[in-house]
Amino acid sequence: ESGAVVHLQGIARDTTDEISDFMEAASAAGVDLILSSAGVSVGEYDFVKAAISTHGKIDFWRVNLRPGKPLAFGQYRTIPFFGLPGNPVSSFVTFLLFVQPAIQKMCGLVNDPSRRLSAYLQQPVQSDGRESYLRAHAHLSPDGDIHAQLAGSHQGSANLLGLVASNALLIVPSGVKSLPIGARVDLLLIGDLTNE
């Protein structure tokens, strides 16, 4: 869907040496981009930063985003590198926002602007003030307006059920802590728009 041909390396154990070996194998395979998931935060088993630094650099490793704060970007040797968060929803969101556009640009493809829509919110939404991408369900009403509500019981970054039940990510801009019912919001479609 993004335009890339995947060269799967498999799963590395949580050691700097094994992660470095995987990076070397990717480099030797002649890939144009290295992508990893997990191991980019600051926990006891997060060794990606150390592995990259042996033959590369990290340009940034955090973004002010929910979900998806631990996101790394840099180079391994001369190859661009993205390190996605380990939580599945965080990984999904950061892939859509950062990695997919990079792959499409590298392939000479254009991002599809029709995936961004405006909708009317059907429930109040609270946020912590960070730019947030909340799992939502969007539908087209008989009057032609698009309406959206949150999907799933909570927005935790490990909640896959909410992601499966959603067809859109509801975008809460940075600095916004609450949105009332009826507020006009931006959406990023991740599935098909449904009818009411």
Model-predicted regions and their roles:
Residues 27, 46, 63:
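Catalytic core of soluble alpha/beta enzymes
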Residues 31-48, 85:
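Glycine-rich beta-strand-to-loop/alpha-helix junction loops that act as flexible
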Residues 53-196:
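Flexible glycine/proline-rich
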Residues 19, 42-45, 91-92:
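Short glycine/serine/threonine-rich phosphate/pyrophosphate-binding segments
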